[in-house]
């Protein structure tokens, strides 16, 4: 929502974005996106044509689909039409609380100059004003349901402040140039509203409704210092945002591992690959693009199976325990006993699965990585590990459950839950490709000092026991198998620029089937659920599926 993205995790990247004139010393060849990657871009274009050009909804949809570049995936086209029709369901006043509001072109920009430096603050969204201009409204978007999550206070305060005090300005062309605000005319702004629209269900929520004085006070208390600090930057923190960073070639904190994926082709546009992305692509290219690149929302009536909820709940409990400081080993008393339903965060574990999950957690005690906490030098819960394969121009991202360091080196820890007791038809790396990615990343030394003696621990929890395993990334056979698996998953994904749907069995568990024109419905409604033992946890619990803008 704010012009300065407050949600990104890398201070250096945020600062670089806050300075449009900053550019890399060495520019690589231009690589155009084959498909639209900003899901709300077509939506904004269609609304612009309806509100400012007088097009009908259908005319606007057809014009944008025909002329916007890069083109949208068919699934994004479905989502765009759904969101547009919901947004414009009441054309005269779709979201406002009382009086009619009228669309405003351009942006509301607060601009100042100090020590020769131009400072600009603005917020992204759709802008509206009352007939006399005394009331302004900024409408922002959430992919899912409006009001379902709280936005950062600094973000909301910035939106309210720029809506209250910003001057109209067109988008700079080129972007490195400053805005050229025009002093507003007419009555002074007296009232400001920030309204959130939910694209999935056409819901709306008023996030702020107050005077300009209240907006100024909120900005001074909760945003001014935050924005100043973000613009100053800080130490780089490589993560999932690296692919879009304009100073990536100058970043010393990002590990570079040419050949990590076994692909010698850097001609494609830079993208990000994780084990979950690779698995989603192998299931269906369209599913991967719609869910993990565009982050389109899941239907409201989609549901997780009890097994999936159980697995997520077990992981959430262990994550909280392993984050405690000082480090202490897990004890039976830390866990629910399973005699009744229980919950952790968003996960409600009920019935038989409440007892199954409790038994799994109880068996974790015997294999807890902090049994000898005094020997642990460092630990990080669910860190984001990233490396740049420059030979393929791909950011490889992983998120282990836990990494910790002892006297031997770094340990990459993964926990799995299952009730499966049947025969094994796959190796551990084949069954869990994220372990294959872990092998290659550890062999490349991406964790820094302590990587030489690194190992991977896998903890499989069942109701009747824990099954620990250990993998040595330095073992030649293990490394060869990991490379075969990773390259086999990465090659087709890397080569594919169209993400054509592959309807079939994958439709049954597809989280974005609502948007896919090629979706094949299951035989019964109960068939369309998310099962745990066959679906990666990272794919299930992807918070970006309800992203806010």
Predicted regions and their residues:
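Non-catalytic protein-protein interaction segments used by genome-maintenance enzymes to assemble
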Residues: 97-171, 382-446
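A non-catalytic, helix-rich entry segment at domain boundaries
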Residues: 24-109, 310-390
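Long, contiguous, compositionally biased segments that the model treats as domain-scale units
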Residues: 36, 40-58, 62-65, 134-136, ...
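Metal-dependent nuclease catalytic regions and adjoining charged, substrate-binding loops involved
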Residues: 148-150, 162-263, 443-549
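Short, compositionally biased low-complexity segments
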Residues: 10-20, 52-59, 127-138, 185-201, ...
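A broadly structural signal marking compact, well-ordered functional cores
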Residues: 283-517, 521-527
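Polyanion-engaging groove/track-forming segments
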Residues: 2-66, 73-74, 160-165, 183, ...
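C-terminal, charged and often intrinsically disordered regions of DNA end-processing helicases
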Residues: 1-8, 238-313, 319, 548-549
